[in-house]
Amino acid sequence: TLTNEMKTQTVYLSRSDNRLDLETDTTYNRYIPVGTRPYDSVVVETGASVKVLGDNGTEFVFTEGQEGSYFSNITFALEMGVDYTLEITTSSGTAYTSKKVGLKGTSEITNVYAERATSNSGVDGVAIYVDSEPGLGASEYYRYTYDETYKIVAPMWAPVDFKLTNYDPCALPEPTYDLEIVPREVQNQVCYNTVSSNTIELASTAGNPSSKVSKQMVRFIGRDNFIISHRYSILVKQLVQSADAYSYYKTLKSFSQSEDMFSQVQPGAIYANVSRKDGKDENVLGYVEAVGVAEKRLFFNFEDLFPGEELPPYPYSCSLETAPESHLSYCYAGPTPPESCPPSVIE
């Protein structure tokens, strides 16, 4: 996705793998990037030559950073009225080119807000909505992405720590040491995590004379989801798409939501806008698009929407365990008792 933001633009290249591993390919973990692990059915394309050409004579060269990810050598932003083409030459010499793409329009997000709501499945939670107005050009088709950041507070945390000095684990008959309880030097009770969206959220105002977006939900979070336990922030991006790009993502979303491959409603084929330069027939997946981006950030606390209510449960089971202070000398030559679990404090 190329944008009108002045930034380092990025192109991702990979190849599909015919191998199917039902265990690894059907198990999703939101905290592990999909597609870049050795056992995923995706092989990143390395060593390629990548550039973007504008019909106004501009040329932007990309250099591979991490494997399969190519970054523009300079920051640039797409311009209205200019059509762009992505050109790729693989390390084996095969050349690909995209159809011409250009900005269709821009928009302005006028409001991002959260309301307590109930989902279609009856779950109590928070709905995050967007209102926007059209800007330049034709703004009728939209895609939404977001980055959410949330505060994590460790439930069992102490402001003190152990300080161990003069420790001799091999002393006989018992280890020798000095152990003090001191204030904790590192404040690690509170931390923050940021997660990017992994769903396809679309909206269309085609047929609406005003082209305004009103109360478009981009995220729903269940009331028991710990990410809203304390402080929560979401940066919403609204991408103005072309009709073709909107159709592509709509079909892709249909595939991702089709739970039964034998259901009566079958998603259509996914057509890419990239092909081989030599005209040879080859299935190419993916889509190069040019979008106008608008963004806005929202903050809220759990108390803002659920005043006086109990916080969501912490996602991990934490329990207090008692450990012995010392241990058997490492140089003890007699019968060895079973190791303690958890290990001793001084270990």
Please place each PLM-identified region on the residue numbering.
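A sequence/structural signal for flexible, mid-protein segments enriched
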Residues: 1-347
